[in-house]
Amino acid sequence: MKWLSRILTVIVTMSMACGALIFNRRHQLKAKTLNFNHKALTIIIPARNEEKRIGHLLHSIIQQQVPVDVIVMNDGSTDETACVARSYGATVVDVVDDADGKWYGKSHACYQGVTHACTNRIAFVDADVTFLRKDAVEALINQYQLQGEKGLLSVQPYHITKRFYEGFSAIFNLMTVVGMNVFSTLDDGRTNQHAFGPVTLTNKEDYYATGGHKSANRHIIEGFALGSAYTSQSLPVTVYEGFPFVAFRMYQEGFQSLQEGWTKHLSTGAGGTKPKIMAAIVLWLFGSIASILGLCLSLKYRQMSVGKMLTVYLSYTTQFIYLHRRVGQFSNLLMVCHPLLFMFFTKIFIQSWKQTHRYGVVEWKGRQYSISKEQ
């Protein structure tokens, strides 16, 4: 069995080498004090039954050091979303129904929201987002100014978890970031065509020139379509990590909501990662199973060193925790038991593949969307 021990050790070593390459570029926001005597930008928040989340976002917006306008686009909410938004001084606009069924997801609400914006700079922010610092909006604007106030800037918020089950989002969040390609030196450095969806910043001129969310009207996950639309007009598209400025808490409704949400994401957003980066990601993830397999076999067969296999497992675990700490705050127990996270990720991936290729339909927030119709 020593030969098997050597093979598994080599596999995990190769896996960790891939792990060192998939997220070895950092793209972080930089803070800078800015002075505005007028509204710095308009924040548009698409919201559907978000009464339990939107208050945290609006409270954090009130704390910002620069003045902003806030528009909440109420997309058919049946709860107290509108009342909560008004209590924080936000302007609430009811989304006009999409009678023809031409729009998917939140794009319809976002596109309508721009017509109510009174500033040239516009930011689209999901209701489950929170600004962690009082200079968060300044950091966003500063970074946008550094790219000439042109194109599209997007941010993947730092993922904060409070309940144990929320930690099962860990691998998905890491894959969301590294799957953007630009965070790895394996990327060929060509123009980025993808954007994160939770926080995006642009200007009206570029937004209308590219078609804005109209270009994503058939996409549940609008970031890729938006990024492609801007790139086609030779406009810059940039992506950044949220920490320490922007965070979110996902799927507070329960474990079922978490499963449905990530099934939706994988159904529509797995095709943008470049092949060599995807290969490195797959090999890195496989290291989770290889490391636990080696440890379990060493406990059964004396020919395999328990100490060696435990060292291999702990080495992989250390890297696993290190990479995930960049994108979120997750349970230490789940981080150590990463094979469970890998198996859950695999389960959702298979479920997503079935919905996409067998049924062609995905459900989210009480609405069904046909994947086959996405352009």
Swiss-Prot record:
UniProt gene name: crtQ
GO MF terms held by the record: glycosyltransferase activity
Location relative to the cell: Cell membrane
Purpose: Catalyzes the glycosylation of 4,4'-diaponeurosporenoate, i.e. the esterification of glucose at the C1'' position with the carboxyl group of 4,4'-diaponeurosporenic acid, to form glycosyl-4,4'-diaponeurosporenoate. This is a step in the biosynthesis of staphyloxanthin, an orange pigment present in most staphylococci strains.
Organism: Staphylococcus aureus (strain MRSA252)
Protein family (similarity comment): Belongs to the glycosyltransferase 2 family. CrtQ subfamily.
An annotated GO BP: carotenoid biosynthetic process
The protein, known as: 4,4'-diaponeurosporenoate glycosyltransferase
PANTHER family: GLYCOSYLTRANSFERASE (PTHR43646), GLYCOSYLTRANSFERASE 2-LIKE DOMAIN-CONTAINING PROTEIN (PTHR43646:SF2)
Transmembrane regions listed in the UniProt entry: 3-23, 164-184, 277-297, 330-350
Membrane topology: Multi-pass membrane protein
EC number(s) recorded for this UniProt protein: 2.4.1.-
Pathway assigned to this chain's UniProt record: Carotenoid biosynthesis; staphyloxanthin biosynthesis; staphyloxanthin from farnesyl diphosphate: step 4/5
Keywords: Carotenoid biosynthesis, Cell membrane, Glycosyltransferase, Membrane, Transferase, Transmembrane, Transmembrane helix
InterPro entries: Glyco_trans_2-like, Nucleotide-diphossugar_trans
Recorded superkingdom: Bacteria
GO cellular component: plasma membrane
Pfam families referenced in this protein's UniProt entry, alphabetically: Glycos_transf_2 (PF00535)
